[in-house]
From Swiss-Prot:
Induction: Induced by BasR. Expression is significantly induced in the presence of zinc. GO terms for molecular function: phosphatase activity. Belongs to the phosphoglycerate mutase family. Ais subfamily. This is Lipopolysaccharide core heptose(II)-phosphate phosphatase. The keyword Hydrolase applies. The gene is ais. It comes from the Bacteria. It comes from Escherichia coli (strain K12). One of its GO terms (biological process) is lipopolysaccharide metabolic process.
Length: 200
């Protein structure tokens, strides 16, 4: 009888531990996924991914001047002063964990300015292909990756590009705000979407 009681108590303890672990796992899973169904990838997670394989991070440009009442940096087709501050803050946080990357942008004033303020002096390459947002963008990404297979890549592009990629790769509805991003990688000639970048 005593042995049975001990066994029963052990079983109850085991069940309680399992339930607690399941609850923790459930919370972790909830926190690790965005409401749109994309995995959330913060700076530290991105750094761990970059140790496994080079990453490609695509950002939407910073706040547009022509759609804001905030002060413009310069050209009306560019970004606002607030946009430059936001881009610099994001760049500082990003570079703390991923210091080594090649930098690209589409050929618009707003993406060029965003990339410039993000990078704080890093060489920027402008590529007009990054304005095209169908399957062409995958070809562009693979081409850029092939030039430096071991380097991480940061690309400044547009909301419709990010929306297209999320829908095409994971059937997710992604409506990016300014400076929101997606994390991808190239493997054996294919481009994969890992998740949504979250600057935490």
């Amino acid at each position: 009888m005593l042995a049975f009681c001990r066994s029963s108590l052990k079983s109850k303890k085991y069940i309680i531990i399992l339930l607690a672990l399941a609850a923790i796992a459930g919370l972790g899973t909830h926190a690790a996924w965005s409401s749109n169904g994309l995995p959330r990838i913060d700076n530290k997670t991105l750094a761990r991914l970059a140790q496994q394989h080079p990453v490609v991070v695509l950002f939407r440009h910073a706040e547009r001047c022509d759609r804001s009442t905030n002060q413009c940096l310069s050209d009306k087709t560019g970004i606002t002063v607030k946009g430059t501050q936001d881009a610099r803050e994001l760049g500082n946080a990003f570079s703390a964990d991923i210091p080594d990357f090649d930098l690209y942008s589409s050929n618009t004033v707003r993406t060029i300015q965003s990339a410039t303020w993000f990078s704080a002096g890093k060489k920027l390459t402008v590529d007009k292909r990054l304005l095209q947002c169908g399957n062409e963008i995958y070809s562009a990404i693979k081409d850029l990756q092939s030039k430096a297979p071991d380097k991480n890549i940061v690309i400044f592009t547009h909301n419709h590009c990010l929306t297209y990629i999320a829908k095409d790769k994971r059937d997710a509805t992604f409506k990016p705000d300014y400076l929101d991003g997606l994390v991808m990688h190239v493997e054996k000639g294919k481009v994969y979407l890992d998740g949504e970048f979250v600057n935490h």
